[in-house]
């Protein structure tokens, strides 16, 4: 998804994997992370709670605001985008924010904060699950992603394992550990 042109265009190469598999994996990981975070005392908002939902990007970003009011000041501390990768690899990484972002409400430290959030989560994933580190833990050159161009708070864009490789077994069997790692990484970010 490219967002820096102000309009936002999305393209997903269907040939890179089974689009019926990834949403379910991501939701399991998100629900596990939510349970862990709530156990730590955090208030968590999910953009979807079932596989039947596919909210627009505007709807997803609205969860950063009180009562989903895009005219209000954001009240979320961070936004975590949980994905699985595809295309012939193994391991976990975060997509680095590396652009010139101008959306309303962002702090001057948006890029650094977003990357630190992604790094905190990924460090936990590779140390607390069977997933390895992909690409040194960070995917550069994709800072144009619409999330980074529209999100008003620091955004961690995670690519957790490859659902079209042997990582799928880990993603299926270790969603609890992955959720705990995501929650632990968010907590690390919040306290540093």
Regions found by a protein language model. Name each.
Residues 37-45, 70-79, 128-132, 152-156, ...:
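Loop/turn elements at helix/coil->beta-strand transitions in domains of secreted/extracellular proteins
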Residues 110-140:
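Active-site-adjacent substrate-binding region
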Residues 1-63, 74, 88, 96-102:
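Active-site histidine-acidic residue metal-binding/catalytic motifs
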Residues 57-76, 96, 120, 145-150:
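Mature extracellular/periplasmic domains of secretome proteins
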Residues 101-109, 164-169:
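Substrate-binding clefts and substrate-entry loops adjacent to catalytic sites
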Residues 27-34, 58-61, 114-122, 175, ...:
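Extracytoplasmic/secreted envelope proteins and their assembly/folding machinery
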């Amino acid at each position: 998804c490219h967002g820096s042109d102000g309009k936002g265009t999305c393209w997903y190469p269907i040939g890179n994997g089974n689009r019926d598999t990834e949403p379910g994996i991501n939701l399991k990981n998100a629900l596990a992370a939510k349970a862990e975070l709530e156990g730590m005392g955090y208030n968590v908002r999910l953009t979807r709670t079932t596989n039947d939902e596919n909210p627009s990007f505007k709807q997803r970003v609205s969860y950063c605001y009180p009562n989903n009011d895009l005219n209000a000041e954001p009240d979320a501390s961070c936004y975590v985008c949980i994905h699985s990768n595809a295309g012939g690899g193994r391991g976990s990484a975060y997509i680095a924010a590396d652009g010139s972002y101008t959306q309303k409400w962002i702090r001057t430290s948006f890029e650094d904060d977003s990357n630190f959030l992604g790094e905190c989560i990924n460090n936990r994933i590779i140390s607390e699950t069977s997933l390895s580190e992909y690409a040194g833990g960070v995917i550069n050159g994709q800072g144009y992603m619409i999330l980074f161009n529209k999100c008003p708070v620091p955004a961690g864009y995670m690519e957790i394992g490859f659902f079209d490789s042997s990582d799928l077994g880990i993603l299926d069997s270790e969603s609890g550990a992955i959720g705990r790692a995501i929650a632990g990484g968010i907590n690390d970010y919040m306290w540093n």
